[in-house]
Amino acid sequence: MTKGILGRKIGMTQVFAENGDLIPVTVIEAAPNVVLQKKTSENDGYEAIQIGFDDKREKLANKPEKGHVAKAETAPKRFVKELRGVDMDAYEVGQEVKVDIFSNGEIVDVTGTSKGKGFQGAIKRHGQSRGPMSHGSRYHRRPGSMGPVDPNRVFKGKLLPGRMGGEQITVQNLEIVKVDAERNLLLVKGNVPGAKKSLVTVKSAVKSK
């Protein structure tokens, strides 16, 4: 069954394994999430739990939000997400979900919003090769063919300059190096998408090795 928790990316550091290997890790702070709602097949057409993370001030919440979280006897939340494929019997409305649902060595998928890079060219955005930089080439960092005379148009799917980043990205099969239940921290091997302090979702791996 799927397990999951919402957290905030703190940054990267490194730890040593027992054999002395240096492991780069991303620190994720996952303060206790609260189960706000259980969705059932009878009422909603599918099964899922809705969890909330990070309290926000009462005056910033509207009336429907306040009424929704009142059923779970908790404060309004900044971030609310649904998790599907979970063991519905293991959760109740108002229950706290903590980092100790995971264990050391477990494989997870981490989803976040990538850093926005603004308007970028085809080389940086799509990883294309540049043209020769020598004198007289007249083709250095351009996107490439825009369609010859016969089609008289640019083909669909042509990789062009545009806004880069700011998209939802999921990195799969990352190993949890350490679970610090006292400080609500997860240390995940490698890097995860997003800037510091950005929201990330940690879930059981879909394609675990």
Curated annotation (Swiss-Prot):
Keywords, alphabetical: Ribonucleoprotein, Ribosomal protein, RNA-binding, rRNA-binding
Coiled coil: none
Gene Ontology cellular-component terms listed: cytosolic large ribosomal subunit
Ranges where the record places region Disordered: 118-152
Pfam families, per database record: Ribosomal_L3
Listed InterPro entries: Ribosomal_uL3 (IPR000597), Ribosomal_uL3_bac/org-type (IPR019927), Ribosomal_uL3_CS (IPR019926), Transl_B-barrel_sf (IPR009000)
One GO term of the biological process aspect: translation
GO molecular function: rRNA binding; structural constituent of ribosome
Quaternary structure note: Part of the 50S ribosomal subunit. Forms a cluster with proteins L14 and L19.
Family designation: Belongs to the universal ribosomal protein uL3 family.
Job description of the protein: One of the primary rRNA binding proteins, it binds directly near the 3'-end of the 23S rRNA, where it nucleates assembly of the 50S subunit.
Protein name: Large ribosomal subunit protein uL3
Organism expressing this protein natively: Bacillus licheniformis (strain ATCC 14580 / DSM 13 / JCM 2505 / CCUG 7422 / NBRC 12200 / NCIMB 9375 / NCTC 10341 / NRRL NRS-1264 / Gibson 46)
Source organism phylogeny: Bacteria, Bacillati, Bacillota, Bacilli, Bacillales
Gene transcribed to yield this protein: rplC
